[in-house]
Swiss-Prot record:
Protein name: Large ribosomal subunit protein bL12
Role: Forms part of the ribosomal stalk which helps the ribosome interact with GTP-bound translation factors. Is thus essential for accurate translation.
Taxonomic source organism: Sphingopyxis alaskensis (strain DSM 13593 / LMG 18877 / RB2256)
Family: Belongs to the bacterial ribosomal protein bL12 family.
InterPro entries linked: Ribosomal_bL12, Ribosomal_bL12_C, Ribosomal_bL12_C/ClpS-like, Ribosomal_bL12_oligo, Ribosomal_bL12_oligo_N_sf
GO terms, biological process: translation
Length: 125
């Protein structure tokens, strides 16, 4: 145990350049590459993030365009949001804009269907 403590002390005293040189020497001696270990570890981290994305339960309904049916889309936006005519018109003309934020998946899908039926292009985020 005393030998390990001495090694830790010696390694802690190394400068960055000395540590880099030590790393190269160990890679040559053991026939390994430190970069390969990092590359192998990266996919595991990405895989862990994927299930969290699948479990998303709140969505933003984003109006990306009026599809040439501005009047129908404005009417639908007013019905969904309760905005006045001028505010709904500004929202549609300012696309891409959020029509509804934090909606449940079912509500977001329903709003998307209604807006697309009016001629709008919509995406869920």
């Amino acid at each position: 145990m005393a030998d390990l403590a001495k090694i830790v002390e010696d390694l802690s005293a190394l400068t960055v350049l000395e540590a880099a040189e030590l790393s190269k020497l160990l890679e040559e001696k053991w026939g390994v590459s430190a970069a390969a270990a990092v590359a192998v570890a990266a996919p595991g981290g990405a895989g862990a993030a994927a299930p969290a994305a699948e479990e998303k339960d709140e969505f933003d309904v984003i109006l990306t365009g009026d599809g040439g049916n501005k009047i129908n889309v404005i009417k639908e936006v007013r019905a969904i949001t309760g905005l006045g005519l001028g505010e709904a018109k500004a929202l549609v003309e300012g696309a891409p804009k959020a029509v509804k934020e934090g909606a449940s998946k079912a509500e977001a899908e329903e709003l998307k269907k209604k807006l697309e039926a009016a001629g709008a292009t919509v995406e869920l985020k």
